[in-house]
Every structure is written in C-alpha cells, then in structure tokens.
Regions:
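Structured, hydrophobic secondary-structure cores that serve as assembly/anchoring elements
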Residues: 1-85, 100-106, 112-119, 167, ...
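Intrinsic disorder/low-complexity signal
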Residues: 24, 122-125, 135, 146, ...
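Extended, Lys/Arg-rich, non-catalytic nucleic-acid recognition/anchoring regions
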Residues: 74-154
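Short, surface-exposed secondary-structure junctions/capping segments
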Residues: 137-160, 485-503
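Mixed-charge (acidic/basic) macromolecular-recognition segments
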Residues: 147-192
Length: 520
C-alpha cells in the first residue's frame, strides 16, 4: 500500500517516482526539511503519524542545475547536474590510469556528490573507465553519461580529452574539480507544474507506472497558496483511473462551521475517489523553532496507512478512529454537534482523544452529500471495492503470457472466483447470500479466440453494501496496451447486455453473443 506525494523539494531528481521508507530516506534523496517545500513538512507528518513508505515526485518551476567544468587543453568539457537546484554539490576527478600512453583520446572519470562544499562526506559516487572523445565509439563520453544519475554533458564535446585533475600546488593526480554555484532553485510551483504532462510523464503523470498506489496527496503550492481546483479535478480523475484515493487539504479559511458550509456549497470537487479531513493541524516547525499551522494531508495519509489495509479497514467490527498521535494538535476544536454537519458534507473530523463507540462516525468520501451510493460515500467500503478490482487486475496479468487465449479463460475464472470467495468468507459482500455475492465471466461470451491483437476480457461483479446492488467491471488485458483497461459496467438483466460507462459519460452497448450470458 503506497502513498504518493507530488510537490517541491530542496533537491533530487525531477519527475521521477522515488520510494522512501523513512524521513531519513527523504533527507538522503530530497534534502529534508526546507521552508519553501510544503511537501517536506507533509512527509515529516506522514512518518510521524505512522506512515511506512511513500512515493515522492519532485517538481520544480524554472530550476537550473549547477555546472562542472573540466579543462581540455584550451577547450572545456562542461557537465551539468541531472537534478536542478543550488543544493547539488558535485565534484569530478579525471585520470589516465591503465590507459595506453599513446592513446590521447581516452580517460577515466569519477563523479561524486558530497554533503556540502569542501566536505569529504560522499553521498553518491559514479566511476566511468575508458571514456573517449571519439563520437563513433560506444564509450563516447556524451553517450555513456546519458546513463549517469548525477551528470550529463552540456554542449559540444571538445576535440581534446579532459586534463588530469591535480591536487592544488602539486602534480599529484588525486584532485577534484568542484561544481560552480550557478544553480537555481526556481520559482514557487504552480498548478500547471503539479498537473504536468501525460506525454512527458511529468507532474502527476510521473506516477503513471507506479503500481499498488492507494493514496495521493498534493500539498499546498506554498505556505500561503493552496492547490487550485483545476489540479484537484485532474488529480481526482487520475485517482479514479488508477483506483486510488486523493487526500485533499481543507481550505485555510475554514475556521468555523458556517464558513465550511458556505464553502462546500460552491466547491467543484465531488468525488468518491477523494477524501477530506478537518481541521488543519498545529505542529512544531523545526526550522523556525516554533509551532505552525499546516495542511493535514500528510498526517491524514499517515494515520490512514497505520489503520490497516483496505480489507481489514472495511471488515473490522469497529472502524479505526482518525486519531492523531502525540506531538500534533488540531488548529481549533470541533464540537460534537458540528461533527454531524461536517459528516453530512463528506468532511471527516480529526481527533486527539478517543471517543466511545456510539459517538464514532464512519469516515466519508467527498461524494457524500452528492446523491452517492453508500459504497461511494463511505471510505472503508470505497477502499474495499478499489482493492478488490486492483487485486484482480494485477493478479490476472499472467493471462497474456499464455499462447492460446482460450486456454487461459478457465484458470482465470477459477482464480478470481477463489479470491472473491475468500473475501466473502472474511465477511465481504455480506448483503446477499453466498451464491449471489459475486459473478465472474471469462469465456467465449465476452472473448474472441485467436483475436489479433491478443486480448482477454474478464467480467467481474460483486455485491455492494446495499442489498440488491452490485459493483460490475470489465477488465481487459491486451498486448496492444501497456496497462489493463478497467471499465465500470451495468449488467442489464432483462436484455443480457453490458452497458459500458466511460469518463465522458457516453454509453456503448456491448452485446453478448448469447442472450442468456448474464443470468442472475
């Protein structure tokens, strides 16, 4: 179960999903706490509140990398850091060890990233032996450094190889050339930077290849600028397509019930793939040495992570409370009467003390109050539905490795039925009798043997919380697409047809070849 954070960081690779398992990991990759980085504080709160692993995507607005210049006789070879920003401290060493004395085109290169200028604390090192300035060689310096995580060649490669780096005042080839302080951390990020590009896999779309994504949080753009509704809408749609939950910070101006109720009447985000908690939190800012008020998204992600996986959270007799750990306070208290009003609008209330069971409210999604079904309104049920479909989609990817599609239909059906049966045995889909709790179809009624490109369709239906209602999905594995397609469907029991609902709300009817294909 992974939680993703997208935002500004002090340093680190841009638009790459990096897994961190502790705040120490975050410090190593992204530089730790930084006042302009609301993401750094959100990560600190995440791990303080019980989070165990997170995916971090660093984005920037106009950041520029530092450069490193190697003398090549009268010319210069310029390298630039892969990661932009002022806190990338690099140094390089060049030598000719084990290179033929008659070969004047080859050299060895060592690149190091150090903790600080002049420091001997090496955080990362790369060694490249037998590089050459010959553009036709497989060891051409510009080509080889394309695979470097630290630097790349900037501009043209000179006609002469780099000079050996010498220790100052000596002829000993053990010296280093340090990077210039010409980097730039860039300007504050905008909604445009967060959204990014699906084509370039930047911003939110850098997470496109991340598997097992459970939660996504976009911290405020700056200490005073909140995430815009355009970003929230794109993020909510991204989460719907990836079957994840978006954690939304409450607006900073929500200081009372009336303010909240008025704002909710005009908010444009209503999604069963989004969740919001109130109020904001107060915690120690270790850089400023005083208490500050922060968005609660990082803390919420941590407490949801420690509350257990989707199955245990949905099937437990008592849903875990949204209880903050010690060291963090609420920005203001919410009285018991107002908690019900917040809940009616799909906003959950954080707690610092436990409540008796009869006073606990089930956690809601932001679809609550928008005529959503119970499974879309309540977080535990929504997470269970998303978990079920995700598990089936991932667990059946092997079907494309079978040469004969038809020979995979039976094993796929049995595998999915076994999985759903185990969930039913654990207490899921309990609104109907066992024999009516789920349906799996993967045969010639919805598949064509020998189809090119190869494709396997799996129809899955399982009972919702309300008796007589079902969740129905068509999962399509195809060699023509890198990822499986998962489409919600409506099973028409009278006509035995499948109505496939797309994001743009148009409907396409897929007629089954047998009228009794779906006989419920």
């Amino acid at each position: 179960m992974l939680t993703a954070f997208v935002g500004r960081c002090l340093r680190g690779p841009l638009n790459q999903p990096i897994l961190v398992r502790s705040f120490a990991d975050f410090q190593r990759y992204f530089g730790g706490l930084w006042q302009p980085s609301t993401l750094s504080y959100a990560l600190e709160h995440f791990f303080e509140q019980g989070g165990q692993q997170a995916i971090v995507v660093r984005i920037a607005n106009g950041a520029r990398p530092v450069s490193l210049t190697l003398n090549c006789g009268r010319e210069r070879l310029i390298l630039e850091a892969r990661a932009p920003g002022t806190r990338e401290f690099l140094r390089a060493a060049v030598d000719y060890d084990q290179i033929d004395a008659l070969d004047t085109r080859r050299f060895n290169l060592v690149i190091q990233r150090v903790r600080a200028p002049g420091s001997e604390w090496i955080e990362e090192q790369e060694t490249f032996r037998g590089l050459t300035i010959d553009a036709d060689s497989a060891r051409f310096v510009a080509t080889v450094l394309e695979d470097s995580a630290l630097v790349r060649v900037h501009g043209e490669v000179p006609a002469a190889r780099p000079d050996r780096t010498l220790m100052p005042g000596t002829n000993l080839p053990v010296g280093y050339v340090s990077s210039s302080p010409d980097g730039d951390d860039g300007r504050p990020i905008s909604d445009y930077d967060v959204i990014g590009s699906a084509v370039r896999r930047s911003g939110l779309f850098a997470l496109a290849e991340v598997d097992e994504l459970a939660f996504l949080h976009v911290p405020p753009l700056t200490r005073t600028a909140e995430v815009g509704i355009s970003t929230l809408l794109v993020a909510a749609r991204f989460c719907r397509e990836r079957r994840a939950m978006l954690i939304v910070d409450p607006p900073a101006n929500w200081m009372g019930t009336k303010d909240m109720a008025r704002a909710l009447k005009h908010i444009e985000l209503r999604s069963d793939n989004a969740v919001m908690f109130h109020p904001r939190v107060t915690a120690m800012d270790r850089l400023r040495g005083r208490l500050e008020t922060f968005g609660n998204g990082g803390a919420v992600a941590g407490l949801l992570s420690r509350s257990g996986d989707a199955v245990s959270a949905a099937l437990t007799s008592q849903e875990p409370e949204p209880l903050l750990r010690a060291g963090m306070k609420l920005s203001h208290e919410i009285d018991d009467a107002d908690r019900w009003l917040f809940a009616a609008h799909g906003v959950n209330v954080l707690q610092t003390v436990r409540r008796v069971p009869r006073e606990r409210l089930p956690l809601r999604t932001l679809a609550c109050g928008a005529s959503a079904s119970p499974d879309g309104s309540y977080l535990a049920q929504r997470r269970l539905a998303l978990f079920t479909i995700n598990a089936i989609e991932r667990g059946t990817r092997w079907c494309l490795s079978v040469q004969d599609d038809a020979s995979a239909w039976g094993p796929v059906t049995r595998q999915v039925r076994t999985f759903l049966g185990e969930l039913r045995g654990a207490g899921a889909f309990a609104s109907v009798p066992f024999d009516q709790s789920f349906l799996v179809i993967c045969d010639d009624r919805i598949n064509v043997a020998g189809r090119t490109p190869r494709e396997v369709n799996i129809l899955v239906q399982f009972a919702a919380t309300r008796p007589g209602e079902y969740h129905s999905f068509m999962i399509t594995h195809s060699v023509a697409h890198r990822a499986a397609r998962v489409r919600p469907v409506l099973v028409n029991r009278l006509e035995a047809s499948l109505i496939v609902t797309h994001q743009l709300e148009h409907e396409v009817t897929i007629r089954l070849r047998r009228m009794d294909a779906v006989n419920l």
